[in-house]
């Protein structure tokens, strides 16, 4: 890993441990030799209170490219979520995670995770990634909300 990438991820980890939003977690995975793998993180994002997502703790992986922070990490829900902006693979479709759109090297892990949390209850309908969730969100909001609440129960901590 480049020294810029390593330095930035070490600093991000230090900042996160010092100050992170309530209910979230983010930590580097363990490497095969038992050390920390700063390039791959396990993350948990809680559903926002007073939304259909409340009560769930949604697990993601963050994979950082060698070129981080010039290029954004890839964020994937594991297991994939039913959501208009989550591809069937679990990959999150969000402008700040796209080099050609909103990514800037100054964006922090904390900002990414808060952005994903906001996206859960406020999908970007202009950028659908999952046909079934998108269609249900547009045509049958009641059924969509029911499905989201069931998903929150399945993802309770």
Curated annotation (Swiss-Prot):
Segments crossing the lipid bilayer: none
Subcellular location: Nucleus
Active site: 93 (glycyl thioester intermediate)
RNA-binding is among the record's keywords: no
Gene Ontology MF terms: ATP binding; ATP hydrolysis activity; SUMO activating enzyme activity; SUMO conjugating enzyme activity
Enzyme Commission number(s): 2.3.2.-
GO biological process, one term: DNA repair
Pathway: Protein modification; protein sumoylation
Top-level class of the enzyme under EC nomenclature: transferase
Alphabetically ordered keywords of this record: ATP-binding, DNA damage, Nucleotide-binding, Nucleus, Transferase, Ubl conjugation pathway
Gene Ontology CC terms, in alphabetical order: cytosol; heterochromatin; nucleus
Main location (coarse class): nucleus
UBC core domain: residues covered: 4-157
InterPro entries: Ub_conjugating_enzyme, UBQ-conjugat_E2_core, UBQ-conjugating_AS, UBQ-conjugating_enzyme/RWD
Role summary: Catalyzes the covalent attachment of ubiquitin-like protein SUMO/Smt3 to other proteins. Required for efficient recovery from DNA damage or S-phase arrest and normal mitosis. This may be as part of a checkpoint independent recovery process.
Family: Belongs to the ubiquitin-conjugating enzyme family.
Protein name, UniProt field: SUMO-conjugating enzyme ubc9
Source species: Schizosaccharomyces pombe (strain 972 / ATCC 24843) (Fission yeast)
Taxonomic placement: Eukaryota, Fungi, Dikarya, Ascomycota, Taphrinomycotina
Chain's gene name: hus5
